[in-house]
Amino acid sequence: MAVYTEVPDEALGAFLSDYNIGGLLSYKGIAEGVENTNFFLHTTAGSYILTLYEKRVAEQDLPFFLGLMEHLAARGLACPQPIRTRAGTALGRLCGRPAVIVSFLEGVSVRRPGTRHCRALGRALAGLHAAGADFPMRRPNALSVEAWRPLFAQAEAQADRVAPNLAERTRADLARLEEAWPSDLPGGVIHADLFTDNVFFIGDEVSGLIDFYFACTDAFAYDLAICLNAWCFEPDGSFNRTKGQAMIAAYQSARPLEPREVASLPLLCQGAALRFMLTRLVDWLNVPPGALVKPKDPLEYDRKLAFHRRVTDAAEYGWSP
């Protein structure tokens, strides 16, 4: 279970006394998620999520994340809304960790998204980008192109233990992407981690977007590239162009891509795949003793990179004018 910090009943009761959310009826740890400690709270007033932020989330970034969720929720986006204390603060401390309570969203994530899910996700992504357009705070993407070589340095010596010639392939990818990475694309607030487990559905419609703790200021099309990687590959490693077409068309129905974004899409998809391959590789090679959370397979994204290297045109992802 992804509960890294144990919370005694007495400490939780004292923490909740600062909130106007009714009396606690029950609570339980949530197994999903690998970055933070999460609990489901059931009170006399409703259901909530309590999150304790562990070491991978920088405390100085929390005002950005919490402010963004409040901003997006106020503009009608279905996302967790931080619950403020009676004193008006959203961020507290519990068992030595920064902690926040957010609203509970109905819905379930899908493990095997279909074309209709990809279409709904494209609309939701465009809605997120629009809702965040006037958010005043900025946060640079700490896992963009400048971070990839330092990440690789943590794993380079052992990379070929994971797959033959992985280090050589990665060095070539880094050189190519660092040379050509676009810096002038339309941008603003992006989610940057919109995998299937961070999107809730009721039926075929998106009911909520969660886990904004990689959100940052970057290119909108890079966010789309992350989603194409996460949603449109099949278990056998093939790219499903029908899903890609549905996602891109739905996104463009709300926010048409500019020609320079379309031209950059193959490069952005390569970069998105490399980013997740590298963070997974570092985690794979540094599993702490006794860890209960299994690291994600970096080779899934090595295989996706092999596809992206062959792509020369955004049409291969399903884009059409």
UniProtKB/Swiss-Prot annotation:
One of its GO terms (biological process) is threonine biosynthetic process. Coiled coil: none annotated. GO terms for molecular function: ATP binding; homoserine kinase activity. It is an enzyme of class 2 (transferase). It catalyses: L-homoserine + ATP = O-phospho-L-homoserine + ADP + H(+). Its EC number is 2.7.1.39. Keywords: Amino-acid biosynthesis, ATP-binding, Kinase, Nucleotide-binding, Threonine biosynthesis, Transferase. Pathway: Amino-acid biosynthesis; L-threonine biosynthesis; L-threonine from L-aspartate: step 4/5. Pfam families: APH. The keyword Kinase applies. InterPro entries: Aminoglycoside_PTrfase, Homoserine_kinase_II, Kinase-like_dom_sf, Pseudomonas-type_ThrB. The keyword Kinase applies. HAMAP family: Homoser_kinase_2. Belongs to the pseudomonas-type ThrB family. This is Homoserine kinase. It comes from Methylobacterium nodulans (strain LMG 21967 / CNCM I-2342 / ORS 2060). The gene is thrB.
